[in-house]
């Protein structure tokens, strides 16, 4: 039987690395905000039952009136006020997760090219083992560097994977991981790192090099190219 799946979508980023005052989730790709591209994909995937969208408190009315309603995003269960950091925003989203939700998927609002295949892999793995993420193997040589700018060690590239979202977890596991992080005042760089601190194994499934996170102007150029390819225009 298919598990009940809720997706938490944090979308509280700034436009700092875009050198813009406009938050990156509202930048346009082919005339439509990045966030809308992401949400429409999740809306269309049968694996996702409902969506909890987490945005800055000041954006809540704007998002409801300009994104949720116009694009008929009927899977959105609620628009939740975000926090100071991404982790705080996801924690606020988790407060709205209910007992019927078996699997919690966490996916960045600025990763608009997630595929149903990736999502299926992550959900299946999480349902089976409790925790899973999408990731891609490192293609470049990876160096660990001292604070003085000199190389400390060359890492074994065969063992290095670059984490992406979606990341999926049994509800109780991710709730416990976030509870522990709050108790310890710990901030990780992704959701899986909080689960790892509980000593729970996290399964890695193949992501995609096109499943990019939009953070820089160059990413927007790539995104336009990916979209044109999907639409058969190149």
Curated annotation (Swiss-Prot):
Gene3D superfamilies: Spore Coat Polysaccharide Biosynthesis Protein SpsA, Chain A
Enzyme Commission (EC) number: 2.7.7.60
GO molecular function: 2-C-methyl-D-erythritol 4-phosphate cytidylyltransferase activity
Keyword Nucleotidyltransferase: yes
Keywords, comma-separated and alphabetical: Isoprene biosynthesis, Nucleotidyltransferase, Transferase
Record site feature (Transition state stabilizer), residues: 17, 24
Site (Positions MEP for the nucleophilic attack): residue numbering on this chain: 157, 213
Cysteines joined through disulfide linkages: none
Pathway annotation from the record: Isoprenoid biosynthesis; isopentenyl diphosphate biosynthesis via DXP pathway; isopentenyl diphosphate from 1-deoxy-D-xylulose 5-phosphate: step 2/6
Catalytic reactions on record: 2-C-methyl-D-erythritol 4-phosphate + CTP + H(+) = 4-CDP-2-C-methyl-D-erythritol + diphosphate
Keyword Transferase: yes
One GO biological process term: isopentenyl diphosphate biosynthetic process, methylerythritol 4-phosphate pathway
Similarity-based family: Belongs to the IspD/TarI cytidylyltransferase family. IspD subfamily.
Task of the protein: Catalyzes the formation of 4-diphosphocytidyl-2-C-methyl-D-erythritol from CTP and 2-C-methyl-D-erythritol 4-phosphate (MEP).
HAMAP family: IspD
Protein name per Swiss-Prot or TrEMBL: 2-C-methyl-D-erythritol 4-phosphate cytidylyltransferase
Organism for this UniProt entry: Syntrophus aciditrophicus (strain SB)
Gene: ispD
